[in-house]
């Protein structure tokens, strides 16, 4: 009964809170107990303290509303329902500040090459270079509300590798700075300890190395490479999906590193529990440390990024010009930087001053989609017809999923395709608050990463509304 009560409570919290907050702090909690006590297990001390400080009051309120009897007493503990395996124990110890386990003496496999790249090799059969980009540092990373928590967590890991949050799991859409943050940690560790053994790579590199090792009968060397590092940084972990043999080997690598107190940082385009065709035991382990979402940057952060990049390129970019680009390019940092590079290149070749008018001409093809004038009324009508509901349903206070999802879709499209502010969009959707619109946009971004049907719907709407 207590378990059912907790699931109902989670449903209310998911509706009330922004997706990032819910996924980071509340979704990882596990519950068990009796009629008198609800025991909540947090994966680490950081989550436990944050839930206790920020959410425990609201949890108590919801539980009291859901039961006619006295609400169960809530206790928070670090751990897991499934018990204390070695890996879990290592995770919990690291979460509460245990000191780094001293690993046996092992050969140095990462050093600084003359070019600044970090070369990583395995003797004999397997050899490849996996490097940290020296420009990806915390100093060159522009902080904003969208990435504030992720940056803070990454800096904690850089200061205390292997004992802060292990693994650190960063997720979010493409081009939002996950790789930059991950490599910033590696560069910070390396700066403090030039003898540190850092290995950064894409998940497909791990798969390719494993296949090569099997072909050359060099699997022991493969395992020695990946298990002898001080920090393992793997990008786009979702590419392990459907690769059963790779998942099996990474599972054992994960356990070996965790038990050795070696740091892991993983990135993904979606929340770990939402990765299809990935073993449950792996998805569970991904959540043992700290899971943080990196969101699309808000306008102020986009402007700051542009100004920073222009400064690094020794190019004068007025705040007016930066604001113009930031208003037009809203999808991700990568596209934003690409647009700026195109503008700078055109200015260099033509000798013209960078102004909003010059930018519009340079980016006319890229901005074509954003320049389409689409009304909120047209968006609401198109979405309602597509999902076979009434416009009145979209504007209503109904919260059933069959109405909520189309409403969130329409709000996200309105933000993407119109120049209306969030309060104006909220007002057009039945007098809702701007935070509701912002939450709807976040939900759509996340669902597009995990739900192919919804992603196709969104792309279809974009085509219909801009054609």
Curated annotation (Swiss-Prot):
Domain of life: Bacteria
Listed GO biological process terms: DNA replication initiation; regulation of DNA replication
InterPro entries, sorted: AAA+_ATPase (IPR003593), Chromosome_initiator_DnaA (IPR001957), Chromosome_initiator_DnaA-like (IPR020591), Chromosome_initiator_DnaA_CS (IPR018312), DnaA_C (IPR013159), DnaA_dom (IPR013317), DnaA_N_dom (IPR024633), DnaA_N_sf (IPR038454)
Spans annotated as Domain I, interacts with DnaA modulators: 1-80
Keyword terms: ATP-binding, Cytoplasm, DNA replication, DNA-binding, Lipid-binding, Nucleotide-binding
Domain II as annotated region, ranges: 80-130
Domain notes: Domain I is involved in oligomerization and binding regulators, domain II is flexibile and of varying length in different bacteria, domain III forms the AAA+ region, while domain IV binds dsDNA.
Subunit structure: Oligomerizes as a right-handed, spiral filament on DNA at oriC.
NCBIfam families: DnaA (TIGR00362)
Entry protein name: Chromosomal replication initiator protein DnaA
